[in-house]
Amino acid sequence: MQTYDAGTFDVIVVGAGHAGVEAGLASGRMGAKTLMLTINLDMVAFMPCNPSVGGPAKGVVVREIDALGGEMGRNTDKTYIQMRMLNTGKGPAVRALRAQADKWDYQHEMKHTIEKEENITLRQGLVDRLVIEDGVCKGVITNSGAIYYAKTVVITTGTFSRGEIIVGELRYSSGPNNQQPSVKLSEHLEELGFELRRFKTGTPPRVKSSTIDYSKTEEQPGDDHPRAFSFDTVEMMLEQLPCWLTYTNETTHEIIQANLHRSPMFTATKKGTGARYCPSIEDKIVRFSDKPRHQIFLEPEGKNTEEVYVQGLSTSLPEEVQREMLRTIPGLENVEMMRVGYAIEYDAVMPDQLWPSLETKLVEGLFTAGQINGTSGYEEAAGQGLMAGINAARKVFEKEPVILGRDQAYIGVLIDDLVTKGTEEPYRLLTSRAEYRLLLRHDNADLRLTEIGHEIGLISDERYERFLAKQRAIEAEKERLQKTRIKPTAEVQAMLKEIGSGELKDGILAADLLRRPEITYDKIAQIVSRETFVTDEIAEQVEIQIKYEGYIQKSNLQVEKMKRMEDKKIPENIDYDAISGLATEALEKLKKIEPLSIAQASRISGVNPADISILLVYIEQGKIAKVSK
């Protein structure tokens, strides 16, 4: 095919899903001339699976994206149809916001946001190859012969990468939702020497709302006072749509059991590795055969559609089996299926081939982000996309990459896990993966990351000033409570008795009283007068910082210890073969991962403390061998 020069840019982003839109917006807003290429302009920021944003760990990622200057939180606040704070009965480390989004409004709003950015060109096109010169990525070539040149390229092709949809015995080449897949780019990456692996994910059927008998289900309303994802959002929509809870039963399970031989999950037709934490209904009834029922949530996909997402019923069973099992579920006896559930297999680049900046080790100037890196979920994709876009733009401007630490953000945990440990299955972010999760809370994402967002140019001066004012207000209120003494008056004793807290024998500082588990900031406010108004947001922050002060200090000490290890950098020219005493597995892993610090090396699977000690001695003695040839 004849090719032609279609233009030159600073950054090219391939794909416009949740990773791609964050990468493109970050790059463009930082001043880089950015081209975003996507197979179908009608699919920008499309939600091919669950129409929701947030949840445990993931909701914190959305807040972090917002604190750094990304778009997912703002877009969700504009387009949600339900908002709920999860785990409110637990500690602040595991609380998380989750929204049901209006699927169609979400993508239209995001596309409009991109179109308004003056530094971004949004264009429809299918990328088949990269332009590589002397190991450096210089651009992309589309299937129509257009050559676009750039200083850096970010690939965010997600499940479109050589995608194949599977429904029972039916298998065909496709991206999600029957879109055109990206086949030749995967083949080209293999030609370049990248290690790819087949992963799998799935989605449940969609059913028609008017054919559901909601009287047989349990209503799940949103919060009366919904919280925002974005620190920029001032007003929240109060009108929300409910979700509905129902359950599978023994009849459902019998139908599935009788058709397991037709499920790709249990036959040789499935080649990809599936997500452990998002199992299909077939997988659930086999793995948890003792359970008589499983939860099913009926979630509306938007305000102006009849489609309802059947959460908990992800499946790739044949179409007629899906219809039969749906109709065994209470409330769905006469349901009409609008879209069939399916599994999709796709290519993933093994992420240990990346630097922590998300630039590939094999090709300079080439970055990858999102599900192509082996992750699952919109939020994980968006977090990677944001960081890849930031670092692609910074490379153009000859600046050092931004690498978030495990103590700074869940995004930092996510990327470090990927590039240091790799993944054998679609990676899902969990609170248990973060060793400093008390520091990485939903409520303090702005306190952790706004400074960085402002420094790199994604947070405006106006927003930064508001952030500084909030910081000052928090410190002022903490100081006031640490100086204010509460006397054991009749009013105070009555309040304490009412909530089952021990009465005071002597006066006590307000901050010390607040440390009691049963005492809230609101209770303190009832007995301690205030000269200035304190917002709910500031009150929450003051209460958490005072109440959990001891635990937070302990976590900070652990962070300091870890940072001393992070500060011990491993020289770029180190020759691991020259280090005697390293275990064979450790030697192989260190050569493959190429860790940047002793701390990162210590997190590599197969590298044990003895290997780290040998490595430390080698570096500290200055025995850095000549560069390997």
Curated annotation (Swiss-Prot):
The biased composition feature labelled Basic and acidic residues covers 215-226
Q: Which residues bind NAD(+)?
A: 274-288
| Keywords associated with the record | Cytoplasm, FAD, Flavoprotein, NAD, tRNA processing
**Which terms under GO biological process does the entry name?**
tRNA methylation; tRNA wobble uridine modification
Positions of region (Disordered): 203-226
Coiled-coil region(s): none
Binding-site residues for FAD, renumbered to this chain:
15-20, 127, 182, 371
- Asked if NAD is a keyword of the record, the answer is yes
Q: Which GO terms describe its molecular function?
A: flavin adenine dinucleotide binding
Record carries keyword Coiled coil: no
**Highest rank taxon of the organism:** Bacteria
The record's subcellular locations are: Cytoplasm
Q: Which cofactors are reported in the record for this sequence?
A: FAD
Subunit annotation: Homodimer. Heterotetramer of two MnmE and two MnmG subunits.
- Known role: NAD-binding protein involved in the addition of a carboxymethylaminomethyl (cmnm) group at the wobble position (U34) of certain tRNAs, forming tRNA-cmnm(5)s(2)U34.
Family matches, as NCBIfam families: mnmG_gidA (TIGR00136)
> Which family does the UniProt entry place this protein in?
Belongs to the MnmG family.
- Put simply, this protein is called tRNA uridine 5-carboxymethylaminomethyl modification enzyme MnmG
Instruction: State the species of origin.
Output: Listeria innocua serovar 6a (strain ATCC BAA-680 / CLIP 11262)
